[in-house]
Design a protein with these regions (language model features):
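Hot-dog-fold acyl-thioester-processing enzymes
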Residues: 2-67, 120-143
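HotDog/MaoC-like acyl-thioester-processing domains
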Residues: 2-7, 11-13, 72, 76-81, ...
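Short amphipathic alpha-helix that is part of the acyltransferase structural core
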Residues: 37, 145-179, 185, 190, ...
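Conserved acetyl-CoA-binding loop-helix of GNAT-fold acetyltransferases
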Residues: 86, 221, 227-240
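Conserved beta-strand in the GNAT
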Residues: 113, 192, 199-208, 212-220
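Conserved GNAT acetyl-CoA-binding A-motif
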Residues: 235, 242-255
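C-terminal "cap" of GNAT-fold acetyltransferases
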Residues: 275-292
């Protein structure tokens, strides 16, 4: 394998070399590079908008490494910022071949080839790669979006939105279901993001707050897929809906842990923090330019 180039890849996983990764030669211990690629593979699935465990269960199989080949071109050192790149290069009947590279800036330090086999998790015998998974991998490498956002009424989106919200707010954050659900759902504008398997993975809603002011809330993203673009896509879909109906401003009550997310999307804080449903929140605001 010769060194690879950044422009060959769509997917990058970023990391910094830790002290624990470095050996007595003051370079990354060779075996850790496979761990870097394996960690990046988890992020690759996030980029596909597919929660790994539930997706593979639904597809009736799992992925097993058949072969891993690594070639070392140069060494990474303590505190280096690295980017681990992956690309699905070939899909056979039951196997998938990925090529990978680890970059420091423009320099390719490591290149690799990973071969996975799709197999029955009980018998560990190979099975054909499901057509739906094949299509998703090909679409991702072709640069296509991995999720779509539908904006609509509660009547159309209730089942999917409720499922995502229950997982996040009721099960994960232990908010009583009586507080999570309210009468505003019936008249709110809702948004649901679905992956390419048609599974709802993120949601949010928009309700009137005051004349010309909309309030976004019930923002929830599948736990495994946080840190991707799904939350931002739902947020901007709701902001667009607010603009279209003539709102000049949107506000929201951000959980303190999500304040940075909303700030990156142009929201600013106003007022003091407060507690809501037992969780610290802060009000945030974003001006809009209503559509004419």
């Amino acid at each position: 394998m010769s060194p690879l180039h950044r422009q060959n890849f769509r997917f990058f996983h970023r990391l910094r070399v830790r002290w624990a990764d470095v050996d007595m030669q003051k370079i990354v211990f060779n075996a850790h590079y496979l761990t870097y690629f394996d960690t990046a593979m988890g992020d690759y699935w996030r980029a596909l908008a597919l929660p790994y465990d539930s997706t593979l269960q639904a597809l009736g199989g799992d992925l097993y490494v058949k072969k891993a080949t690594i070639e070392y071109h140069a060494s990474a050192q303590m505190d280096d910022q690295l980017e681990v790149a992956l690309q699905c290069q070939r899909i056979g009947t039951s196997s998938m071949t990925f090529k990978g590279a680890i970059f420091r800036g423009e320099d390719c330090l490591i290149s690799c080839e990973l071969i996975y086999v799709f197999a029955d998790p009980t018998t560990q015998t190979s099975k054909p790669v499901p057509p739906a998974l094949r299509d998703i991998l090909l679409a991702f490498e072709a640069g296509e979006p991995m999720a779509t956002v539908e904006v609509g009424a509660w009547q159309a989106l209730q089942s999917e939105a409720s499922q995502v919200r229950a997982e996040v707010f009721v099960k994960e954050q232990r908010i009583p279901i009586a507080l999570e659900q309210d009468a505003a759902d019936a008249t709110a504008v809702h948004a649901v993001a679905r992956n390419r398997l048609g599974v709802a993975v993120a949601t949010g809603r928009l309700v009137p707050h005051a004349p010309g002011v909309g309030r976004i809330g019930r923002m929830a993203v599948n736990r495994v897929l946080r840190g991707t673009q799904l939350g931002g896509e739902v947020l901007h879909a709701l902001m667009a809906a607010a603009e279209q109906r003539g709102d000049h401003t949107v506000i929201l009550h951000a959980q303190q842990t999500a304040q940075g997310f909303y700030a990156r999307h142009g929201f600013t804080t106003q007022g003091a923090s407060f507690e809501e449903a037992g969780i610290v929140h802060i009000e945030m605001v974003h001006p809009l330019v209503p559509s004419l």
